[in-house]
Amino acid sequence: MPMRSAAVPAPASQAPQSIDVREGLARNAITFPDGIPGFEACRRFVLLASEAIAPLQRLEAIDGPPAAFVGIDPRLALSGYRCRLSATDMHALGADASTTLLWFAIIASEADGTLVANLRAPIVINPERMVGRQVLPDDGLYPIRHVLQGRA
């Protein structure tokens, strides 16, 4: 969904102003230095949450071509979910063992309306550094298409 400038009411003594919503979002941007596979041109995203769709969240590009993903914390999609990050992934995220990371499994709707989450290649975000990365653990323990309850 494209962001547009919005008029801001100004005091009577000042001329009308406008603000760029994207500029405001950019202050909270998560940088993906390598992009997301298939969307490498998109490097900055915002994570949007709303009670209306909780526990789902939306990861939306604020640069590059339009791109947005709906996802869920994989630990909510599958009880006992654990994913071990490689040293390379930890370094790319600027994280260590004490860093609290955010996890995001992309959800897709299949032709019959079944919702599936990609638990094999989650997006991991370091909120302290505002850096994200889609990871692909070597163990391959989890499916790319984990069926969620409900339909689109």
What are these regions (language model features)?
Residues 81-90:
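Short beta-strand-centered segments at strand-helix junctions
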Residues 2-80, 98-152:
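Long, compositionally biased stretches
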Residues 90-96:
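Structured, beta-strand-rich domain cores
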